[in-house]
Every structure is written in structure tokens, then in C-alpha cells.
Amino acid sequence: MTYALEVDGVDKSFGGATILRGVAFAVESGSTTAIVGPSGCGKTTLLRLIAGFEKPDAGTIALAGRVVAGGGWAPAHRRSVGYVAQDGALFPHATVGANVGFGLPRRARTPARIAELLEMVSLDPSYAARRPDQLSGGQQQRVALARALAREPELMLLDEPFSALDAGLRANTRRIVADVLAKAAITTILVTHDQPEALSFADRVAVMRAGRLAQIGTPREIYSTPIDVPTAEFIGDAVVLSAHVDGSRARCALGDVAVAANGVHGNARVMVRPEQIELTPDGAGVSGTVVDVEYLGSEMLLGIRLNTADGMVPERVTVRRFGATTLTPGDRVGIRVLGKAVAYPA
């Protein structure tokens, strides 16, 4: 299979500081991949290497089977790659039309082609006469996308393009951009530090930590079966408890719970998501005491201190509950675990 992008054993350092170490992954044509990780983990550096703005110290990068870095070098303008930066990088004193047209060959910079590109990103062609400061942040990012699309790239790179937008505008702009790229069937890589954004935007998610890729998989795999505890805790709220695993069951502060088969036995740590913990209407299951209630609008997070037995140290867990609740700190509740926990070596 020829992949749209292949990265193999890539290292990169700046001033003696190692930023990327042995990064390797492949991206299928027409797919969307999100690279998610905390600030400073190396994800933007990786994107710049793919774009051709920097050279790797070791390893190779290939686009559609053609090596463009390591064993050969193709500068950015020789790669069929579109790039949208975090701030859009529009020319502030040029019109929207001129900004979009910058991505086109001179002979193709016609009003009709610019109008077509604006319509692709759900902007009225009349916006061509405006300047960037007359647009909202979301509209500016869509203009930046239109400019990148003008080159008809085989690969689109998005470097945290929604991070500067407020929550409502960010979600709407993200949906529009995802729809545009899907209709154009352009292979896309999104870099973000926003976990829900990565999970909702992409077909596959790559979790980056300290210059390495910790795990690559579908959004469901990354969220439901993270490879280790740090990945579990980074990608979403996680309840992690000490446990003893025997076959397909684990004994922990949440009681006797089912675990996904992954070869872990004996002393271990188990992870469940807050939404897997259910309050029992009759108080059955493990008992606990509500210690705090966090209101988040459509959902609530309940902090519950478990009333453990068998000499186990009391544990505090978080329970996600949708809708309103009458529970207050001090109330006693019963809880049980739905589905399977994931076990990790102690």
C-alpha cells in the first residue's frame, strides 16, 4: 500500500534539546489524523518537518511514496501540502480575495475561482472585498483554509487552527472545516492539545508525549483502551485505582469489576471512565459518601469517597452524571461499574 504520508524514525533537536525521538507512523490517503499532546511535546515541530519548513536530523518522510526528507530533500514549495497556522497568517492589509488568490498561479487568480474557493469554505463571495480585520476569528480561519485549498494539495496540515476561537465558534468552525476537507477527499493532519477536538475530528488519533508517539488508534480505541495510565489520564477524565487482577476480574475499591483481557495479572492498577460508574437507586453495590458536586451545565461531576472494607485505603472517585441531581455533600450513595475496566501493571 502507498500511504499519503510515511514518517519513519524521525529525530529532531534544537540547541541540544531533543524535541522528537524515533517518531514513526503512516497516514492512509483520504483519512484524517489528529496528533494530540500537551504543549511542548513536539507536535508542531513534527508538522513543520512534514511541511518542509524544517529538516529532520534523522529518519525519513515520504509523501505518496516519494521521499521528501532524509535520503532526499524537497523544499516546502515542492511538496503538495497545504498548511493552516494557528493564527491563520493572513496578510492584514490585503483583501480576502487577494489572500485567497495568493495560493493560486497568477493566471488562475480570477474572481470566479476566488468566489469558488470562498464558497467551498461556506463564505459568501462578497467577502472577497473585505479585509481580515472585518471578519470574525472563525471566518479568518476559513479564509486561510480557502487559500491553502487553492493549491489543490494532496495533504492538508492544520496547526491548532481553532485554539484561539471561543468555544461556540470553535465547534462550528471545526465542523465546517471537517466537512470541507471530507468533501474534497484531502488527507488531513490536525495538531491540537484539545482532547475532545482530536477525538471528534479525526478517523485516527496519535497521542504524543515527550517527543514520542505513545499510541495511535481510532478515537474509540484511544479513549476506551489507552495503552498506559499517563495516556488514559491525558486523553480524558480517568478513575485509576490499585487492584488485584485474577483472570477476567479485578478486586479494587470499586468492588469486584470485569477487566478487558490484556495479559495483566496480579497486583495492578485499573482504569475506568467516570461515565462507567453508576449510582444505584437502592444503594446496592459499593457504598460511598458524596464529598463535592461540580455543576457543568448539561452534566455534573460528583466526587465520592468510597467506604472501603477489607482494610483497603479509602479512595475518592469521580462520577459523571447527566442532568440535574439532588445529591449534596454528605449524602450516602451506592455505586457500581458498568462495562469493563482496563488493567495496567502496578
Curated annotation (Swiss-Prot):
It catalyses: Fe(3+)(out) + ATP + H2O = Fe(3+)(in) + ADP + phosphate + H(+). Residues 5-235 form the ABC transporter domain. It is found in: Cell membrane. The keyword Transport applies. The keyword Membrane applies. Pfam families: ABC_tran, TOBE_2. Keywords: ATP-binding, Cell membrane, Ion transport, Iron, Iron transport, Membrane, Nucleotide-binding, Translocase, Transport. GO terms for cellular component: ATP-binding cassette (ABC) transporter complex. Belongs to the ABC transporter superfamily. Fe(3+) ion importer (TC 3.A.1.10) family. The complex is composed of two ATP-binding proteins (FbpC), two transmembrane proteins (FbpB) and a solute-binding protein (FbpA). This is Fe(3+) ions import ATP-binding protein FbpC 1. It comes from Rhodococcus jostii (strain RHA1).
